[in-house]
Amino acid sequence: MAKKTKKTEEITKKFGDERWKALDDALKNIGKDFGKGAVMRLGERAEEKVQVMSSGSLALDIALGAGGYPKGRIIEIYGPESSGKTTVALHAVAQTQKEGGIAAFIDAEHALDPAYAAALGVNIDELLLSQPDSGEQGLEIACKLIDSGAVDLVVVDSVAALVPRAEIDGDIGDSHVGLQARMMSQAMRKLSASINKTKTIAIFINQLREKVGIMFGNPETTPGGRALKFYAYVALDVRGNTQIKGTGDKKDQNVGKETKIKVVKNKVAPPFKEAFVEIMYGEGISQTGELVKIASDIGIIQKAGAWFSYNGEKIGQGSENAKKYLADHPEIFAEIDHKVRVHYGLIELDEDDVVEDTQVEDTSDELILDLDSTIEIEE
């Protein structure tokens, strides 16, 4: 029988034990018919905090608030052409594989570059790739992969390229009003429960379109109807900003671009936070670059003039040399990355971190004692 609380005792006084007995019988019957856990008290759930997986970008993890993409949820990434949407998604694929998971990529645009994916850290030998003939086929493949429970991440690139079969079979110029929106709406209804149950992360990349005749307000919209907007737990707006000039022999060349990623929807943490990353051509997001900037902003890496220092040791003159130092010393990179994540509350404190704080306090006490003893001697 269910454990009684103060409120349940009051109900029992009013209506007797029959009401609780009827509820217990109903819960048992529901469990038999639909399986254990079909109905439960919210406090009985083992997991209260949403599990996350790193996005592969420290700046984006901080902007997301929880430290990465929530597991068992739908993510939408949209933005203008060549803004870095696929790059952001491929970093998530690389991170999934790095953590020992399995990732699948539904390439509806038929435009995935294996060499570029490999440069971003994706193990292309282990990546599951599908290039579907129609939108229904692509979504059905994604559904079967998610239902299997064996895949940790599914990326669909892109929603705009998921063309309904009726449109493919028809002639150019035929009207197919609402076909794609109905297809996406049906897919979201079918996928959402399965995604949550299997704790799979589903990333849908989307393009931008403009509404005709809009004089006021934002004319931009995304294809595929409103279903994805409703079902998405997190939505990211990716926009490329200024070009990054090279140094040395490449000083006249553009080697990358500064990109702004805005969290326009977030059900895990407060939305509308922004992450600024450097996407280097042929390399992806500069993880050393964002670490140098963030760590120096919060004082973990010290900056004096053009020099960057860590723990009293100079690591480079200028940001480029500091980035090179961190790339050549992965153990230092991991140590600084850990401290930054602890600072922003993305991960819990380790015992080592607590010990370090204790040591600092003890040292300060010793200094105070020494100062007092000195004063006594002078008197």
Curated annotation (Swiss-Prot):
Matching InterPro entries: AAA+_ATPase (IPR003593), DNA_recomb/repair_RecA (IPR013765), P-loop_NTPase (IPR027417), RecA-like_C (IPR049261), RecA-like_N (IPR049428), RecA_ATP-bd (IPR020588), RecA_C_sf (IPR023400), RecA_monomer-monomer_interface (IPR020587)
Function: Can catalyze the hydrolysis of ATP in the presence of single-stranded DNA, the ATP-dependent uptake of single-stranded DNA by duplex DNA, and the ATP-dependent hybridization of homologous single-stranded DNAs. It interacts with LexA causing its activation and leading to its autocatalytic cleavage.
CDD domains named among the record's database cross-references: RecA (cd00983)
UniProt cross-references to PROSITE patterns, sorted A to Z: RECA_2, RECA_3
Record Gene3D superfamilies: P-loop containing nucleotide triphosphate hydrolases
One Gene Ontology CC term in the entry: cytosol
Superkingdom as given in the UniProt entry: Bacteria
Gene Ontology molecular function: ATP binding; ATP hydrolysis activity; ATP-dependent DNA damage sensor activity; damaged DNA binding; single-stranded DNA binding
GO biological process: DNA recombination; DNA repair; SOS response
Protein's UniProt name: Protein RecA
SUPFAM superfamilies for this protein: P-loop containing nucleoside triphosphate hydrolases, RecA protein, C-terminal domain
Keywords from the UniProt entry: ATP-binding, Cytoplasm, DNA damage, DNA recombination, DNA repair, DNA-binding, Nucleotide-binding, SOS response
Organism: Streptococcus thermophilus
Compartments, record wording: Cytoplasm
Residues binding ATP, per UniProt: G79, P80, E81, S82, S83, G84, K85, T86
Family membership: Belongs to the RecA family.
